[in-house]
């Protein structure tokens, strides 16, 4: 990728996060023509014909027209104008479901391999999601931001190759109004990921197992609050032993602060509950299974999370069996 050539970015997953990400990358940044395309599935026809209408709190309502729109990964992989260009950034924003699909193998047709090949950017929940990509694309730059829709956007490198791709992303986001975008070390990024589990690994599964209880109501219920606090505390005590670094009280809210904040957040439902109610697979492995397995590799137990994982995994299995007696998860 020369300094004068267009930069080709492909977003795999045209949901809310993917479309927002795309809209903030597409355009001319510091003289570079960044062309962002989308791989859509169920919404392909609508986006191909009409583009994307975004409604945001920080940036208002606006319209975004992608450079190209594809109905499948295969179609996007075939489209490189006869090999005239590569996908410089392959950005994955789909749900991470390693028990169902291998994301690295799925995106393989899109990736130009090697140090100077495609940079793989993983905007997905959970921990351990990068391992299959490291195994498949050992020389490619791999980045795993925290949530783009949070108050700040940390972008960090998860491979041993150059970090120029990440610095480019940070500069493009900053130029387009995301002022808190910043580069982070792999260790700092992993720490942020583990801290996010305090919410995702405690409240999401507990909401499903308690019959669809919203986060705020769980935080106000004395028994559930005790349970949630214990789950968060388990992460707070285990993660530093795995990462070798303590949480920073200035950057990472304590369980007490998280629960206090949750009391006031009465809107919305946890994503795992929405998936459960819609009959979709839940992100059990990356939010619960992977942390438990990573801890075990270091000789550590996470009994609270393991209990949630065991119960919810069986509940999902039973639900699938009831819907289709031949289904096996």
Where are these regions (language model features)?
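NAD(P)+-binding Rossmann beta1-loop-alpha1 motif at the extreme N-terminus of oxidoreductases
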Residues: 1-68, 74-75, 82, 89, ...
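NAD(P)-dependent Rossmann-like dehydrogenase/reductase catalytic/cofactor-binding core
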Residues: 2-8, 74-81, 225-329
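Short alpha-helical
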Residues: 42-46, 98, 127-128, 164
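Rossmann-like NAD(P)(H) cofactor-binding subdomain of soluble oxidoreductases
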Residues: 65-144
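Helix-loop-beta segment of a Rossmann-like dinucleotide-binding subdomain
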Residues: 111-114, 143-156, 208-220, 269-277
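Rossmann-fold dinucleotide-binding core
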Residues: 123-196, 202
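Active-site-proximal catalytic alpha-helix in oxidoreductases
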Residues: 190-217, 223-236
